[in-house]
Curated annotation (Swiss-Prot):
It comes from Pectobacterium carotovorum subsp. carotovorum (strain PC1). It is found in: Cytoplasm. This is Probable lipid kinase YegS-like. Keywords: ATP-binding, Cytoplasm, Kinase, Lipid biosynthesis, Lipid metabolism, Magnesium, Metal-binding, Nucleotide-binding, Phospholipid biosynthesis, Phospholipid metabolism, Transferase. Binds 1 Mg(2+) ion per subunit. Ca(2+) may be able to substitute.
Length: 299
C-alpha cells in the first residue's frame, strides 16, 4: 500500500485565521494525509520550519502566504542537500501573489492544498544574489521597488494588488532615474534607468508583467530595463498595461552584474536589498515544486 505523503505547512501569521484553509486541512487529514502546521511570526521562522520538515522526513513543505513567504521557504529549501530536500507547494494568501498567479496556482484553498500535496513535482530554477540572498520570482529595482516597498500595509489589505498602482500615482514625485551599469554574457548596458526587472517569474508589483517571456525551468533569467530616456506617459502605459515598448531593453542571461555609483535597492520577492553591486545568477533545477500541468512558466 502506498503511503500518504508527510507534509509540513508553513503559514504566514497574518493568515493564521483563514477558515477556508483550516477546513481544507481538516478534509485532507480525514482522507488520511499527514499535515503538520507551523505559523511564522518573524523572519527566520520559515528556515527553522524547513529544517524541522527534514527531521520529520517530510515529502512536502508548503508555503502558505504571499510572495515573501514563498521566497523565504524556497531559499531555505535551496540550501538543503538534494537527497533530503522536500518538494515545495504554494498556497496563495498574500496581497499580490505574483508568483502563484503567473503559475496559475488555484486561489481556492482546497484545490491549492491538493495541488501542493499531490500535484506533479517539477524541477525549477531560483536565483541567487550576492552569494547569500535568493529570489524565486523577480528582483526589481528603481521606481517600481520604491512603490512596492513603501505602499502602506493598510492600503494593501484594503485594495490588494491595485494598491500598488494607486500608490504609484500618488508618488510621482519619487520618479527619478538611477545610474547603473549592467553586464553579462554578450551583454552590456550603461545609463540612467527608471525600472530594472530580473525575472525567473514574469510578474511583480501586483500583476505588472515586467518579464513576459520568463520561464522557471530554462536555466535563464529575463532582464528588462526601462531607460530614463523614455517619456513618462509611454512608461506608465507600458508598465501598467503590459503593452509593448520599443524603448524597453531586454536580454536573457544565466547571470548578470549590476553596479552603481550610489546605493540601489532591489526588491527580491518583496524583501529589500541595498548595495552598490549586485551579482545575480540562476541556479538551474535548484528545487522541486508542485505546479499545475497548464503552468505557462514551464518549457
Amino acid at each position: 500500500m502506498e503511503k500518504n505523503p508527510i507534509t509540513l505547512l508553513i503559514l504566514n501569521g497574518k493568515s493564521a485565521g483563514n477558515e477556508e484553509l483550516r477546513e481544507a486541512i481538516g478534509e485532507l487529514r480525514k482522507d488520511g494525509y499527514t499535515l503538520h502546521v507551523r505559523v511564522t511570526w518573524e523572519y527566520g521562522d520559515a528556515k527553522r520550519y524547513v529544517e524541522e520538515a527534514i527531521q520529520l522526513s517530510a515529502d512536502n513543505v508548503i508555503a502558505a502566504g504571499g510572495d515573501g513567504t514563498v521566497n523565504e521557504v524556497a531559499a531555505a529549501l535551496a540550501v538543503q542537500p538534494e537527497a533530503v530536500r522536500p518538494c515545495l507547494g504554494i498556497i496563495p494568501l498574500g496581497t499580490a501573489n505574483d508568483f502563484a498567479t503567473s503559475c496559475q496556482i488555484p486561489m481556492e484553498m482546497h484545490n491549492a492544498l491538493t495541488l501542493a500535496i499531490k500535484g506533479r513535482a517539477t524541477d525549477i530554477d531560483i536565483a541567487k544574489v550576492n552569494d547569500e540572498h535568493y529570489f524565486i520570482n523577480m528582483a526589481t529595482g528603481g521606481f517600481a521597488t520604491r512603490i512596492t516597498t513603501e505602499t502602506p500595509a493598510k492600503m494593501k489589505a484594503a485594495l490588494g494588488s491595485a494598491s500598488y498602482v494607486l500608490h504609484a500615482l500618488f508618488r510621482m514625485d519619487m520618479l527619478q532615474a538611477e545610474r547603473c551599469e549592467i553586464h553579462g554574457p554578450d551583454f552590456h548596458w550603461a545609463g540612467d534607468t527608471l525600472v530594472i526587472a530580473v525575472g525567473n517569474g514574469r510578474q511583480a508589483g501586483g500583476g505588472q508583467e515586467l518579464c513576459p517571456e520568463a520561464l522557471v525551468n530554462d536555466g535563464l533569467l529575463e532582464l528588462s530595463v526601462l531607460s530614463a530616456k523614455e517619456l513618462l506617459p509611454n512608461m506608465l502605459q507600458a508598465w501598467f498595461t503590459g503593452s509593448e515598448n520599443q524603448n524597453m531593453i531586454s536580454a536573457t542571461l544565466p547571470w548578470l552584474e549590476i553596479t552603481a555609483p550610489d546605493d540601489m535597492t532591489f526588491n527580491l520577492d518583496g524583501e529589500p536589498l541595498t548595495a552598490k553591486r549586485f551579482r545575480i545568477e540562476v541556479l538551474p533545477a535548484a528545487i522541486r515544486c508542485r505546479l499545475p500541468p497548464q503552468c505557462p512558466l514551464l518549457e
